[in-house]
Swiss-Prot record:
This protein binds to 23S rRNA in the presence of protein L20. This is Large ribosomal subunit protein bL21. One of its GO terms (cellular component) is ribosome. PANTHER family: 50S RIBOSOMAL PROTEIN L21, LARGE RIBOSOMAL SUBUNIT PROTEIN BL21M. InterPro entries: bL21-like, bL21-like_sf, Ribosomal_bL21. The gene is rplU. Keywords: Ribonucleoprotein, Ribosomal protein, RNA-binding, rRNA-binding. Belongs to the bacterial ribosomal protein bL21 family. GO terms for biological process: translation.
Amino acid sequence: MFAIVKTGGKQYRVEPGLKLRVEKLDAEPGATVELPVLLLGGEKTVVGTPVVEGASVVAEVLGHGRGKKILVSKFKAKVQYRRKKGHRQPYTELLIKEIRG
């Protein structure tokens, strides 16, 4: 059985036992979070409008971290204007425990 869940403005296909990196959630490591289900798949597919009523995905927060550094540059020709800035996107790592519904 699998489910499509939405968190952080993105959609993910999840199954029990899967480790997943999502946009940073406001939850402590070791806590459990419930994610809304957009679609349930398996023997019979159930599509939500927009979410499947009575269905949820239970996940455990494994920890928080920061992604790889990306560099952003600004440049304007002929005026010696150059700027370089780095960014590391924060994330939360989840372990999918079960799919209810």
